[in-house]
Design a protein with these regions (language model features):
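PAPS-dependent sulfotransferases, especially Golgi type II membrane carbohydrate sulfotransferases
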Residues: 1-61, 226-270, 276-365
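PAPS/PAP-binding and catalytic site of the sulfotransferase fold
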Residues: 70-84, 179-183, 201-203, 270-295
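PAPS-dependent sulfation machinery
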Residues: 87-167, 215-240
Length: 365
């Protein structure tokens, strides 16, 4: 049994790892690795606190969100705005620009949505050099990776937009550094949802898995690419390959936390799903003021927003069940990702500086 699995088993029997064990584990760990680019130290504050040198009230917008975080709701609101051309998930494998490939299916949980592809109607399939890897491979991209085809595709969408362009992504989480480097004049908005509700919402065709399920026994239906994301990202975050004995929610939470780190570092604005559905007019009004979307809060669709999908996690397990597993995941990330990885010199950090980050789970509970 390898070291990580020993820690997992031990953690299942105790709520936290003590400082003594912490020190002993660190002594057994390999030499500190170099963090992959994109995991920037956060001592300088959140990216949203730093002003970028372009007019965000007129600039194109890109939305980044985990699956089942309300991104379709936000996209629908923006789509209805007369001064906006809002593209739905450009990296979706259905290829919205290709009528023969995309089909006609619309998710019944996406209220008020008749199609996802109208904005793509002027784009010829022959003009896009589509790459299947965009959907599930190379999910992490540093700013140094060219990815010419992906760049050309996004540039094409921005250029084809009849109005101010908005691109709603669910596969940009770990590509944010690349995106911001390649498209420095595009504002980045992060939509965040409670990780518990977000995970439960991924069970669309099947009931949620048992509270005793593990990743190893495949006691759950993976409807939103959780395992494939873990496999791809484990090339950079080896911890994600050592999770067989954990509950599927814990894997979802780990990726959620890592996604949060990227967002905290790179985006210009964070919008909480819970605020959006509980206080839609105020929340959308603040978003509209920040990004110059005049009249967005007065769109008719705002009246149809409700908070029925908030805190559904309580029907699955009690708070202690979730807190125990989230605390264990936070500890594992601190031990094997954040605290154990040394920042590269080109980030201006001294040798031995450690990443410092805090969980923001409480903000959306």
């Amino acid at each position: 049994m390898n070291l990580l699995k020993k820690v997992f088993y031990w953690g299942l029997r105790r709520e936290s790892v003590t400082a003594t064990v912490d020190g002993r584990i660190r002594q057994q760990m390999p030499v500190s690795a170099v963090i992959p680019q994109g995991f920037l130290p956060l001592e300088g504050g959140l990216a949203s606190d730093r002003v970028r040198e372009f007019d965000q009230r007129q600039a194109p917008i890109a939305i980044t969100a985990r699956f089942r975080s309300g991104s379709t709701l936000l996209w629908r609101l923006l789509r209805d705005h007369p001064a906006v051309t809002a593209y739905y998930e450009p990296l979706n494998p259905r290829r919205w620009f290709d009528a023969e490939h995309r089909g006609t299916k619309v998710d019944k949980t996406h209220r008020g949505v008749c199609d996802y592809w109208s904005e793509y109607s002027g784009i010829s399939p022959n003009s896009v050099r589509w790459d299947e890897s965009w959907t599930s491979d190379d999910l992490y991209l540093s700013k140094l990776q060219p990815k010419h085809r992906l760049y050309d595709y996004i540039k094409l969408l921005l250029g084809q937009a009849q109005n101010r362009s908005v691109l709603q992504f669910n596969r940009l989480d770990f590509r944010l550094e690349w995106f911001k480097h390649r498209f420095p004049g595009v504002s980045l908005i992060h939509l965040q949802r409670n990780p518990r509700d977000q995970w439960l919402s991924t069970f669309q065709k099947h009931p949620p898995c048992s509270k005793n399920a593990t990743i190893a026994n495949r006691g759950f239906q993976d409807e939103f690419y959780l395992l494939s994301w873990a496999r791809d990202l484990s090339r950079y975050i080896p911890l994600l390959a050592e999770l067989d004995d954990l509950h599927p929610y814990e894997l979802s939470y780990l990726i959620w936390r890592l996604s949060e780190v990227f967002a905290q570092t790179h985006v210009d604005y964070t919008l909480q799903y819970e605020s959006l559905v509980k206080n839609p007019r105020q929340t959308i009004g603040e978003l509209a003021d920040r990004f110059g979307l005049i009249g967005l809060a007065d769109m008719p669709a705002v009246e149809s927003i409700d908070a029925r999908s908030v805190k559904r996690w309580g029907s699955y397990a009690d708070p202690d069940w979730f807190k125990t597993r989230e605390s264990r995941c936070d500890r594992l990330l601190d031990l094997f990702v954040f605290s154990n990885f040394v920042a590269e010199d080109h980030y201006g950090s001294a040798p031995g500086d450690k990443i410092k980050t805090t969980s923001r789970t409480a903000d959306c509970l």
